């Protein structure tokens, strides 16, 4: 909307400002709901991950004690990306988390459960990074 108005050399109209306000309000709602449910999202994601891949918690598995922290960090970065509408913060960290074996997909599944199920379409693209 902004780039289109700029290309035309126009100020934003009231309708365009209202549309932008609605987008920002939705993003704030998403971030607030994820933040409010972050502990449950990560707990449920970890539980699901370990049920699906019990070898992670077996001796020699990849479930180090900092795994929950890593999952929380991924979720925090998703909130940054959601509020900004820009997933580059996730792109910058993707290789690091993949190398560490951090289960971002499990956090994404956690968002899809419980009170956050309506947020899935809003944040799904950020978890695909």
Swiss-Prot record:
User: What is the membrane topology noted in the UniProt record heading this document?
Assistant: Peripheral membrane protein
Instruction: One GO cellular component term, please give it.
Output: plasma membrane-derived thylakoid membrane
> What does the record say about PTM?
Two isomers exist. Contains two covalently linked bilin chromophores.
Sites bearing N4-methylasparagine, chain numbering: 62
| A Pfam family this chain is assigned to | Phycobilisome
UniProt keyword annotation of Transferase present: no
Instruction: Say if the entry is tagged with keyword Electron transport.
Output: yes
Task performed by this protein: Light-harvesting photosynthetic bile pigment-protein from the phycobiliprotein complex (phycobilisome, PBS). Phycocyanin is the major phycobiliprotein in the PBS rod.
Q: What is this protein called?
A: C-phycocyanin beta subunit
